[in-house]
Amino acid sequence: MLTYETWEENVVSFSEEDETKGALSVLNWAYKEYKDEVVYACSFGVEGMVLLHIINQVNPSAKVVFLDTNVHFQETYELIQKVRERFPSLNIIEKQPELTLDEQAKLHGEKLWESNPNLCCKIRKILPLEKSLVVEKAWISGLRREQSETRKHTKFINQDHRFQSIKVCPLIHWTWKEVWRYVYKHSLPYNPLHDVGYPSIGCEKCTLPVGDGGDSRDGRWAGKVKTECGLHYQ
């Protein structure tokens, strides 16, 4: 088994000559390699809808973890319910932070997402994912190379130093248009905020719509240097 500790570069290759541009091959390999010791960390963005559809074909009872920060858009929570109805056998786990919003405010002040967004992300996203990955050998992410400069070198299989795990990224070669083409072709549910200028959807407090021609992640932590929540730092 390929693990963080036994990591070797390029030990496996995947065919990209199909509708999924390698994603189906990558997921077949991941579930064969790790069986029930791999989890998909899903934010329920539009890429997530594609991955959930393909994962459901490969492993209908796969584990899916949603990092519920308690400050997501209502539309996101409603989408999760639609996904549960569409893929009833998937094991969707809503992972909560250790601190409630009230407890966080007492310790660190009100609106931590404004005063210290990095700490807020650590408390409400990074630490919960760390706890989820303790019992896993690998995790799956919907990163695409096209999304940003920080993601353009992502590979199908990555040694993840942040979580000391294997990070599997099946959608690295997909474009934004290809993601949407797949969603429409398979009549997949998606967050309606995508239709009103939100290409990337995170927490309600830190996500704004993006104007025409803007980068897909310009709406995340707008006005701050921060562009990533910290889950994908290498």
UniProtKB/Swiss-Prot annotation:
<dbReference type="InterPro" id="IPR014729">
    <property type="entry name" value="Rossmann-like_a/b/a_fold"/>
</dbReference>
<feature type="binding site">
    <location>
        <position position="203"/>
    </location>
    <ligand>
        <name>[4Fe-4S] cluster</name>
    </ligand>
</feature>
<dbReference type="GO" id="GO:0046872">
    <property type="term" value="F:metal ion binding"/>
</dbReference>
<comment type="similarity">
    <text>Belongs to the PAPS reductase family. CysH subfamily.</text>
</comment>
<feature type="binding site">
    <location>
        <position position="120"/>
    </location>
    <ligand>
        <name>[4Fe-4S] cluster</name>
    </ligand>
</feature>
<dbReference type="InterPro" id="IPR011798">
    <property type="entry name" value="APS_reductase"/>
</dbReference>
<comment type="function">
    <text>Catalyzes the formation of sulfite from adenosine 5'-phosphosulfate (APS) using thioredoxin as an electron donor.</text>
</comment>
<protein>
    <recommendedName>
        <fullName>Adenosine 5'-phosphosulfate reductase</fullName>
        <ecNumber>1.8.4.10</ecNumber>
    </recommendedName>
</protein>
<keyword id="KW-0560">Oxidoreductase</keyword>
<dbReference type="InterPro" id="IPR004511">
    <property type="entry name" value="PAPS/APS_Rdtase"/>
</dbReference>
<dbReference type="GO" id="GO:0019379">
    <property type="term" value="P:sulfate assimilation, phosphoadenylyl sulfate reduction by phosphoadenylyl-sulfate reductase (thioredoxin)"/>
</dbReference>
<dbReference type="InterPro" id="IPR002500">
    <property type="entry name" value="PAPS_reduct_dom"/>
</dbReference>
<dbReference type="GO" id="GO:0070814">
    <property type="term" value="P:hydrogen sulfide biosynthetic process"/>
</dbReference>
<feature type="binding site">
    <location>
        <position position="121"/>
    </location>
    <ligand>
        <name>[4Fe-4S] cluster</name>
    </ligand>
</feature>
<feature type="binding site">
    <location>
        <position position="206"/>
    </location>
    <ligand>
        <name>[4Fe-4S] cluster</name>
    </ligand>
</feature>
<dbReference type="GO" id="GO:0043866">
    <property type="term" value="F:adenylyl-sulfate reductase (thioredoxin) activity"/>
</dbReference>
<dbReference type="Pfam" id="PF01507">
    <property type="entry name" value="PAPS_reduct"/>
</dbReference>
<dbReference type="GO" id="GO:0004604">
    <property type="term" value="F:phosphoadenylyl-sulfate reductase (thioredoxin) activity"/>
</dbReference>
<keyword id="KW-0479">Metal-binding</keyword>
<feature type="active site" description="Nucleophile; cysteine thiosulfonate intermediate">
    <location>
        <position position="229"/>
    </location>
</feature>
<dbReference type="GO" id="GO:0019344">
    <property type="term" value="P:cysteine biosynthetic process"/>
</dbReference>
<dbReference type="GO" id="GO:0051539">
    <property type="term" value="F:4 iron, 4 sulfur cluster binding"/>
</dbReference>
<keyword id="KW-0408">Iron</keyword>
<dbReference type="GO" id="GO:0005737">
    <property type="term" value="C:cytoplasm"/>
</dbReference>
<keyword id="KW-0411">Iron-sulfur</keyword>
<comment type="pathway">
    <text>Sulfur metabolism; hydrogen sulfide biosynthesis; sulfite from sulfate.</text>
</comment>
<keyword id="KW-0963">Cytoplasm</keyword>
